[in-house]
Design a protein with these regions (language model features):
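Extended, charge-rich alpha-helical interface modules
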Residues: 1-82
C-alpha cells in the first residue's frame, strides 16, 4: 500500500474496508488521496523549516488539505451506505 494509503488508514481507522474498496474502484478517491498526501508533505516540509512559504500560503495549503479530507470522508460515507 502507498504511503498515502497508510496515512488515510491512520486518519480513518474504523473505515479500512471502505478505504480499500475506494482505492480499488474510484479514480476520484485515488486522486484525492494523492493530493492529500502531497499537501501533507508540503506542509510538513514548511513546518520543519525545510521549505519557506508566506504565512498566507501555508494557511491556504492547510485549507486545501482539510477540503480534501472532507471530500474523502464524504466518499467513505457514500461507500459505506452502498
Amino acid at each position: 500500500m502507498s504511503e498515502a494509503g497508510h496515512n488515510l488508514h491512520a486518519l480513518f481507522p474504523d473505515h479500512g474496508p471502505a478505504l480499500h474498496a475506494l482505492k480499488l474502484g474510484s479514480s476520484n478517491f485515488r486522486q484525492l488521496a494523492e493530493e492529500h498526501h502531497d499537501l501533507q508533505s508540503r506542509i510538513q516540509r514548511v513546518e520543519a523549516g525545510l521549505a519557506a512559504v508566506a504565512d498566507d500560503q501555508l494557511e491556504d495549503l492547510k485549507k486545501r488539505r482539510l477540503f480534501t479530507l472532507d471530500e474523502i470522508a464524504a466518499l467513505i460515507a457514500i461507500e459505506e451506505e452502498a
